[in-house]
Amino acid sequence: MKIIRVSKNEMKHTSRGIFTYFNRKPVKMLKGGHGESNLQYLRKNGLKYIVNNVDINGVRHGQIDCHVRPRERKYNGHAWFPIQWNDNIIAKAGEHVANLKKNSKINDHMQMHGKYKKVYVVAYKSRGRICGICPKFKQER
């Protein structure tokens, strides 16, 4: 079985997020942004967000006012990995989940589920590569 990996470019999407820009300033968040670097980027650029609660395993839930998806702008519509998870740990979590035997037959762009360091993780793949990693919204206890 071929090992599924995540690219550096995909980690930018997953961790910091993808934005639209006006005059070289980010104005709307399109997708991704599940790492601490997303919160740092939002703060740096004066974009409003709220972390409403933190699960026992460190997964944070909240909202991002500049997100294009309405559900991400609402209470607990967005999830971030634990604060101590850097891009390297997020990548390892995504690769771990994508390479679980139970996920080997999952089609492209469908959710693959697994657990890594007490966090339930969702990963997506496309053409043999990971194209998205995020914490599962409902962290099981």
PLM regions and their residue ranges:
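N-terminal "domain-start" segment
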Residues: 1-111
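Active-site or metal-binding loop neighborhoods of secreted/extracellular toxin and effector enzymes
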Residues: 99-141
